[in-house]
Amino acid sequence: MAKYIFVTGGVASSVGKGITVASIGRLLKARGVRVSVQKLDPYINVDPGTMSPYQHGEVFVTEDGAETDLDLGHYERFIDVNLTRLSNVTTGQIYSAVIQKERRGDYLGGTIQVIPHITNEIKSRIAAVARQTGADVVIVEIGGTVGDIEGLPFLEAIRQMRKDVGRDNVLYIHVTLLPHIGATGEVKTKPTQHSVMELRRVGITADVIVCRSDYPITDEIRDKIALFADVDVEAVVPLHTVDSIYEVPLVLEEAGLGAYLTQRLGLSASRPDLDDWRDLVARIKAPKRKLAIALVGKYVELHDAYISVVEALRHAGLHQGVDVDIRWISSEQIEEEGCEPLLHDVYGIVVPGGFGDRGIEGKIAAAEYARVNNVPYLGLCLGMQVATISFARHIMGPESRANSTEFDLHTPHPVIDFMPDQLDITDKGGTMRLGGYPCKLTPGTRAYAAYGVDVVVERHRHRFEFNNKYRRLFESAGMIVSGQSPDGRLVEIIELRNHPWYVGTQFHPEFQSRPDRPHPLFRDFVAAAAKTFREGDQRPLPLEQNGAVTEHEPHSR
């Protein structure tokens, strides 16, 4: 029988539950324990696919096409496992399922209530993870903060789980914040005491308290928390703020959490092997030269909107021995000020995914700037599409008004257009091309050199695609289709022939990058940027003109 670790949060949101859960998964995996992870989100949306990035951050897409919480990205990167739609459950999903069953008559005329119908549905989703993955331990994070009204059904469900599967098979971890009072220099425990009491009111007694703090906590503070929370001192685990999230598993291991969980759950575990992880952290902390990379987007005020892109860049930088210095550039600011003041000193440009026409001309300008000035460029989803639009306007002239039908339904040159199977779809949620699809690579291209295989599977999230009516024109002018669907109908990767490194992907490679195994395209993109950086950018830079190549003065960065 699988065992379950339930992780709740107290005092404040964003205390680091997701990273804590991912780190616990890493500690157990290092002991040979089979682990799976699940996130329970109390919001009423069915999934985050239609939510504003400003409210939710990134939408992480799983291999099987689920639009999920960004914490699943942390789980995958730390534990190195591909999760499925089972790993993210929302209140919207639970109520939708229960109402559908009621409409079918599954409840035989009974009165549908939160207990037992909603809680039973939640418990069935939790059990499904263990059943379908064969995990020894399922770690379940409950989103939000203890005391939130929308989280009560989830807390009741995990309370019942201890009775359903046996007390020895369930463990509760409470992640809480210890605020620091600057005026007195004290770390305060009172909010944690109250948070533990709030958890007890719903019938859950925490077995472990993980104490988040910006400062190291003393043994005296641990003793005090242990007394009021009624746990072993060993179960009060300090977790102070660190420079890199990848240090967290080592901090928790040093605090004895891995050994404590193994003992409390009676797991058959081997000696922990964290040597590779320690080496990873040592390389992260080693001094490195900074490499400026611009990330041009419309949600740059909230870095979590692009968290997988950020992590993929860091993974690639670590592999290349450089510290990627991300310059957050608003595409709307480019529209106002132009590219030169904002991009003149960067060595690579990334344009990530997005939707809507706000700031779109700034993204197109960034793609054009990278092409003209031979700055290494990586376009992701929309970033590939704006590169296509930029190239179309270059070879056909700005008066062509080449565009995507997403931004101009009446453009005379729709070089990016609706996918045929999207034309009759009116609903927004869960209706895009989602999840992993195969991509056949073209030998002799940068994409093929990066991957080193003929066919790859990458994750998608889009409604629009390259318009194949323009494919022959583009290829004759110097844009190569270096990846396509196996049937040849969908362009997946484009790149420029006469450029140091210019690649756009219709998919999202950032979702499959790992700290110890950077994604091949990010790896080679950062390598190209680092090469420019190390050479001092003194190369002559060719400027394409309708397929021809001319020389102009080196661009100064």
Swiss-Prot record:
Region feature Disordered, mapped onto this chain: 536-557
Region (Amidoligase domain): 1-267
Catalytic site: C381 (nucleophile), H508, E510
Annotated Mg(2+) binding sites: D71, E141
InterPro entries named among the record's database cross-references: Class_I_gatase-like (IPR029062), CTP_synthase (IPR004468), CTP_synthase_N (IPR017456), GATASE (IPR017926), GATase1_CTP_Synthase (IPR033828), P-loop_NTPase (IPR027417)
Binding-site residues for UTP, renumbered to this chain: S13, K188, T189, K190, P191, T192, Q193, K224
Pathway where it operates: Pyrimidine metabolism; CTP biosynthesis via de novo pathway; CTP from UDP: step 2/2
Subunit structure: Homotetramer.
Xref: PANTHER family: CTP SYNTHASE, CTP SYNTHASE-RELATED
Catalyzed reactions per annotation: UTP + L-glutamine + ATP + H2O = CTP + L-glutamate + ADP + phosphate + 2 H(+); L-glutamine + H2O = L-glutamate + NH4(+); UTP + NH4(+) + ATP = CTP + ADP + phosphate + 2 H(+)
Additional information: CTPSs have evolved a hybrid strategy for distinguishing between UTP and CTP. The overlapping regions of the product feedback inhibitory and substrate sites recognize a common feature in both compounds, the triphosphate moiety. To differentiate isosteric substrate and product pyrimidine rings, an additional pocket far from the expected kinase/ligase catalytic site, specifically recognizes the cytosine and ribose portions of the product inhibitor.
Species per Swiss-Prot/TrEMBL record: Roseiflexus sp. (strain RS-1)
Name this protein carries in UniProt: CTP synthase
SUPFAM superfamilies: Class I glutamine amidotransferase-like, P-loop containing nucleoside triphosphate hydrolases
